[in-house]
Amino acid sequence: MSEASAAATGKSLLLETSQGQVEIKLLPDIAPNHVARISELAASGFYDGIVFHRVIPGFMAQTGDPTGTGMGGSGTKLKAEFSDYKYRNGTVGMARSMSPDSGDSQFFICFDGCGHLTGQYTVWGQVENGMDAVEKLAAGEPPATPDQIISAKLID
């Protein structure tokens, strides 16, 4: 395990969104490099002010693109860390293009219809508190008035 991922062990990511707080338990045991990168981006303020650019009720809410279009990222691609962790309500996964190793900074939070993503998209977190805030996010691709991440920070 890298020093960065070791530092993230046992931590959570707290998203302050325009709909309320969302606490995500980080899962470094199954995706150490993704947890390390998400932690690094959050600590740098990268996610602050970024919108939820794709929200599909019954499926997922996606964010992490600084352009708000679904086409942007941080510029650093990550090698996939697929696992048997089952996607369910509140599971947080890394968005990617057709290439499995194209995850960057965009991620999604599942509602209920995500089971088919298991083993195909890297899981790096699980919402522990605040799914009610996620469920209130404005729907659309993109939403007419998208909700945003006000701040993202690591907590113990």
Q: Where do the protein language model's features map onto the residues?
A:
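Cyclophilin-like peptidyl-prolyl cis-trans isomerases
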Residues: 1-156
